[in-house]
Amino acid sequence: MNNDAKFPIQLTDFAARKVKFFTENEIINSNSHLKLRVYIIGGGCSGFQYRFILDDKISSDDCIVENNGVSLVIDPMSLQYLFGGIIDYYEGLEGSRFVVINPNAKNTCSCGSSFSV
């Protein structure tokens, strides 16, 4: 496992508070071992899509970033697309969601969930 000192990706304080809220919420059985995993899949209108899940499994080659007791987990393949990025949480009229501020994205779709490099 790697830490955030080697891999420059940030989890904002607000996003960390939201992860903590979700993992402590009764709906998901108060599993404090859950971590926010962000990963990339092919698809979407721009070629790649961001996905987020709460996960309790960690691989030995995953990158782990900590903020206020909350862990963000990224697999090595996804990390190459997210390097230097910021994971945040957005709340607005159209809903709320985790978002990626990705300096590697050349183009993004209007909803912000897909990108190209």
UniProtKB/Swiss-Prot annotation:
PROSITE patterns: HESB. This is Iron-sulfur cluster insertion protein ErpA. GO terms for molecular function: 2 iron, 2 sulfur cluster binding; 4 iron, 4 sulfur cluster binding; iron ion binding. GO terms for cellular component: cytosol. GO terms for biological process: iron-sulfur cluster assembly. Iron-sulfur cluster binds at residues 45, 109, 111. The keyword Cytoplasm does not apply. Homodimer. InterPro entries: FeS_biogenesis, FeS_cluster_insertion, FeS_cluster_insertion_CS, FeS_cluster_insertion_RrpA, HesB-like_dom_sf. Required for insertion of 4Fe-4S clusters for at least IspG. Pfam families: Fe-S_biosyn. SUPFAM superfamilies: HesB-like domain (SSF89360). It comes from Blochmanniella pennsylvanica (strain BPEN). HAMAP family: Fe_S_insert_ErpA. Its cofactor is iron-sulfur cluster. Binds 1 iron-sulfur cluster per subunit. Belongs to the HesB/IscA family. Keywords: Iron, Iron-sulfur, Metal-binding. The gene is erpA.
